């Protein structure tokens, strides 16, 4: 049973890490950018994330 708990803990850590990475991969509105993909739900216009 201990192995099962270890595996669940390991998966939880991986999920948390992936979510944290995804959250940091995009910039909020008004942030500096180069490509549209850098902005969360916005476009990159004049080097700034805009709606």
From Swiss-Prot:
Tissue-specific expression = Expressed by the venom gland. The most highly expressed peptides U-Asilidin1-Mar1a is around 3000 times higher expressed in the venom thoracic glands compared to its body tissues.
- What cellular-component terms does GO give this entry? extracellular region
Listed as disulfide-bonded, the cysteine pairs are: 26-40, 33-44, 39-49
Q: Where in the cell is it found?
A: Secreted
Q: Does the keyword Signal apply?
A: yes
Secreted among keywords: yes
Q: Which UniProt keywords apply?
A: Disulfide bond, Knottin, Neurotoxin, Secreted, Signal, Toxin
Q: Where is the signal peptide?
A: 1-23
GO MF annotations for this entry? toxin activity
Primary localization class, coarse = secreted
The record's function comment reads:
Induces neurotoxic effect on honeybees, including slow movements, disorientation and paralysis. Since it provokes similar symptoms than omega-atracotoxin, it is probable that it acts in the same way by inhibiting voltage-gated calcium channels.
Query: Record's domain comment?
Result: The presence of a 'disulfide through disulfide knot' structurally defines this protein as a knottin.
Task: Report the sequence similarity comment from the record.
Answer: Belongs to the asilidin-1 family.
Q: What is this protein called?
A: U-Asilidin(1)-Eru1a
Q: Native species of this protein?
A: Eutolmus rufibarbis
Q: What is the lineage of its organism?
A: Eukaryota, Metazoa, Ecdysozoa, Arthropoda, Hexapoda
């Amino acid at each position: 049973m201990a192995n099962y708990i270890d595996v669940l803990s390991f998966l939880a850590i991986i999920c948390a890490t992936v979510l944290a990475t995804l959250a940091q991969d995009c910039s909020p509105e008004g942030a500096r950018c180069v490509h549209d993909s850098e902005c969360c739900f916005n476009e990159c216009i004049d080097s700034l994330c805009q709606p």
